[in-house]
């Protein structure tokens, strides 16, 4: 009976040596969980089929309707100029819809400014059509053009409503203290080189467009129209602010600058595509000019309009790409588990690292001592 306590002390069914230094063995939990392991999957668990179907459907409908509207507007260039503008303004929304469909999260609310600005342009084109109908009712045939214009308006209205009603659902990793003490700009790489290259090309294209516009205005006073001055105005307004904002954001990325750049690009992209749609009649003029040989006496004006159209398309594409890159960075930051709304500064992050580092060093030292003791035994 007296040997039983000694047998209990010499038994090997007690706590392991590495676990003796811990105060509460029952509360021990591993640092990583099986759900935290990011396995390579083709279809993420947060994928939304409704968002994907809606994005593909809206993008397809907008592309088809814009294509028919551009064709009909170029068949009747003087009577249906409003239809070309409305069709051009809907192109960035269609591009963004296909971009959203490839994402694994609901990013439609991030493009809400672009959808609202496009809806404003289509509404203006509808008012433009009504004013032309009031001023000269006999010159406009209310047929397929009104159907296309109303269809564009309804599609954009549905897109705006869905973007306002949809909620941002993101797959956030459960990383414990990482979401509390880390900065999103330190975790997710910002596309600084891409935005810098975009800004350089935008400045060069804007200066070239201004010079080409001045030359086009001085070619012949009889052929110059008001559409040139309006187009140049939008180039000057839309090009340089977005280029400057892209360069500043690439140099010093932050939440505020990224949001401002998304807003500027979302506003300028539909306007540039609208001007491109208005000048699309120059393509038909160039085609008609090369049908007859020798060409017309005044081909330089139409060629300059075509070059201006290409510059506008380049500017519009770069602005749309800038918006997509910024939204992609924003979504990637949220997918990494970082808090986009409450962002900690460098001092808080440094304090968190200093607070965590002594604990890690203490754990390593204690584990090493336990190993040495076990080897000695």
From Swiss-Prot:
The chain crosses the membrane at residues 52-72, 82-100, 111-131, 142-162, 199-219, 228-248, 257-277, 304-324. Interacts with ATP1B1. Part of a complex containing ATP1B1, TRPV4, AQP4 and HEPACAM. The modification Phosphoserine is found at residues 177, 179. GO terms for cellular component: basolateral plasma membrane; caveola; cytoplasm; cytoplasmic vesicle; early endosome; endoplasmic reticulum; endosome; lysosome. The keyword Transmembrane applies. The gene is MLC1. Keywords: Cell membrane, Cytoplasm, Endoplasmic reticulum, Membrane, Phosphoprotein, Transmembrane, Transmembrane helix. The lineage of its organism: Eukaryota, Metazoa, Chordata, Craniata, Vertebrata. It comes from the Eukaryota. The keyword NADP does not apply. It is found in: Membrane; Cell membrane; Cytoplasm, Perinuclear region; Endoplasmic reticulum. This is Membrane protein MLC1. GO terms for biological process: caveolin-mediated endocytosis; cellular response to cholesterol; positive regulation of intracellular transport; regulation of response to osmotic stress; vesicle-mediated transport. One of its GO terms (molecular function) is protein-containing complex binding. Residues 1-37 are annotated as: Disordered. Its main location: membrane. Residues 1-23 have a biased composition (Basic and acidic residues). It is a multi-pass membrane protein.
